[in-house]
């Protein structure tokens, strides 16, 4: 549940904001502020890398959010309630790998959706994930 991670004031601020990049950035910073990657670096650096390596605004929003459902207790309903458009939430959902789905099936599903945004974010994500220092 998203409200577990945010103060009521911050939740309302994000809910009222129409700036999707600001909203995604603030939310990601709150959710991952104390997490580190396997290399010991702040996890948000991974999200920033993915953000930096996509071009379109919608892709950038999805890049910042691509791990919130998989790694945190955040639902699609949470993202919709705080004001993210259904297309962005749909792309985040597509990029969320369920534990009962094989990696090959997960990648096939991303391709089959035909979402250019989800595919671009996944490619940027993979590019950063092959960096052995993180």
Name each region found by the language model:
Residues 1-134:
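Active-site helical microenvironments for divalent-metal-assisted chemistry
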């Amino acid at each position: 549940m998203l409200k577990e991670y945010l103060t009521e004031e911050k939740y309302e601020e994000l809910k009222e904001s129409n700036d999707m990049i600001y909203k995604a950035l603030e939310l990601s910073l709150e959710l991952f502020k104390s997490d580190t990657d396997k290399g010991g670096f702040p996890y948000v650096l991974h999200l920033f890398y993915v953000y930096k390596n996509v071009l379109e605004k919608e892709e950038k929003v999805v890049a910042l959010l691509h791990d919130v459902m998989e790694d945190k207790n955040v639902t699609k309903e949470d993202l919709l309630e705080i004001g993210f458009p259904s297309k962005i939430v749909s792309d985040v959902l597509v990029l969320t790998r369920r534990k009962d789905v094989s990696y090959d099936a997960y990648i096939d599903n991303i391709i089959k959706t035909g979402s250019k945004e989800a595919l671009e974010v996944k490619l940027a994500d993979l590019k950063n994930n092959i960096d052995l220092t993180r």
